[in-house]
Amino acid sequence: MSEFDAQRVAERIDIVLDILVAGDYHSAIHNLEILKAELLRQVAESTPDIPKAPWEI
């Protein structure tokens, strides 16, 4: 994902829900982890470096 697109995220969540309905929990969790990582990476790229608090190191 190069930029945040709410429609695309919603579509991917729908896919995960379909996978859950089919009963493939492992794949659904894996897909959610991938989506989370992509979103966090995108946020990290778009925000300036903020010093971490000592408990976040």
Curated annotation (Swiss-Prot):
InterPro entries referenced in this protein's UniProt entry, alphabetically: UPF0509 (IPR020887)
Top-level taxon of the source organism: Bacteria
Expression triggers: Expressed approximately equally in exponential and stationary phases (at protein level).
Family to which this protein belongs: Belongs to the UPF0509 family.
HAMAP family: UPF0509 (MF_01641)
Name of the protein in its database record: UPF0509 protein YciZ
Organism: Escherichia coli (strain K12)
Gene (name only): yciZ
